[in-house]
């Protein structure tokens, strides 16, 4: 009996050994977390400490408004806004130059932010920034991700666009090139360029000058011819005054050279008729000009020399060797006139229509000469 007793003990110990080994190894495995303990602890700390590598989902306007609202005095300087954003969101610790420029632009351009100057003048640099009272509720119930659309408050226009002032400055109006209505207190945005002002116009761009008048010599000679015609018509035919007036025109005409306008100008018929003592136009055409242009001695006449007595109708005819006094080309040349005496000096080649005026037989008052009898035929 004693031999059979210890066998079951060994057998039972051998059978229980693996069970005890398994029980010792089971506590090493971590127990499964309970759903009520671990879930709440992990989710509660995540919003308080955001990921530094992730950009916050807020606009720059929301970041500025958040910093101003959470300040003690409801206003902050630019450096105070920077410090709040860096402390609140570590993402902005890097690349400060980029986002800080965006913060400054939003402060200057957005009407929701008002600049408040510091007290005490220029002792400390920087101004305060605060929120406009009309924009306090621009974020619905503190949700900075959604911004409410609001009407912009009315503000007076800036100084450079005030109504009642012209766009042209005082410099443009003073220069003479400004538009009408430009006051002296204008802004000068549309001032004319310098090259259109009066100082430049006088030097480089002169104003067009009026056309030059007629030459003085032409006007003087035309007036003298008209006066001579009027005087000759008033004095009557054959008067010595008319002859003197017409002969006086040769003085200024001779001083202009051989190609003067006066020498190429024909006298009106009234002047010629009053000069030669005839009432009607000449019956015969003037003789042809000479083929040569050198002056002859019979072309010079003295204004004061008395004409010779013409022959009468009852006188005897001249001998065959003597020419008739009616031919002016072969008449005996009179005494030469002095240099200072006025007289007509016309060349035959240049004035064919006035060749008959050189004969001195036309200066008499009687109409019984041989010349008149020939012209009446």
Curated annotation (Swiss-Prot):
CDD domains: FH_FOXL2 (cd20028)
GO molecular function annotations of the record: cysteine-type endopeptidase regulator activity involved in apoptotic process; DNA binding; DNA-binding transcription factor activity; DNA-binding transcription factor activity, RNA polymerase II-specific; RNA polymerase II cis-regulatory region sequence-specific DNA binding; ubiquitin conjugating enzyme binding
InterPro entries noted in UniProt: FH_FOXL2, Fork_head_dom, FOX_domain-containing, TF_fork_head_CS_1, TF_fork_head_CS_2, WH-like_DNA-bd_sf, WH_DNA-bd_sf
Principal location: nucleus
DNA-binding region ranges: 55-149
Biased composition annotated in UniProt, kind: Pro residues: 305-322
GO cellular component, one term: nucleoplasm
Mod. after translation: Sumoylated with SUMO1; sumoylation is required for transcriptional repression activity.
Region (Disordered) location: 1-54, 277-338
Alphabetical GO biological process terms: anatomical structure morphogenesis; apoptotic DNA fragmentation; cell differentiation; embryonic eye morphogenesis; extraocular skeletal muscle development; female somatic sex determination; granulosa cell differentiation; negative regulation of DNA-templated transcription
SUPFAM superfamilies: Winged helix' DNA-binding domain (SSF46785)
Nucleus as UniProt keyword: yes
Name of one Pfam family that matches: Forkhead
Residues in cross-link Glycyl lysine isopeptide (Lys-Gly) (interchain with G-Cter in SUMO): 25
Phosphoserine found at: 34
Keyword Transmembrane set for record: no
Ranges in coiled-coil conformation: none
Bias type Basic residues, positions: 291-301
UniProt keyword terms in alphabetical order: Differentiation, DNA-binding, Isopeptide bond, Nucleus, Phosphoprotein, Transcription, Transcription regulation, Ubl conjugation
Localization terms from the record: Nucleus
PANTHER family tied to this protein: FORKHEAD BOX PROTEIN, FORKHEAD BOX PROTEIN L2
Function comment: Transcriptional regulator. Critical factor essential for ovary differentiation and maintenance, and repression of the genetic program for somatic testis determination. Prevents trans-differentiation of ovary to testis through transcriptional repression of the Sertoli cell-promoting gene SOX9. Has apoptotic activity in ovarian cells. Suppresses ESR1-mediated transcription of PTGS2/COX2 stimulated by tamoxifen. Activates SIRT1 transcription under cellular stress conditions. Activates transcription of OSR2. Is a regulator of CYP19 expression. Is a transcriptional repressor of STAR.
Subunit structure as annotated in this protein's UniProt entry: Interacts with ESR1. Interacts with UBE2I/UBC9. Interacts with SMAD3. Interacts with DDX20.
Name assigned to this protein: Forkhead box protein L2
Gene: FOXL2
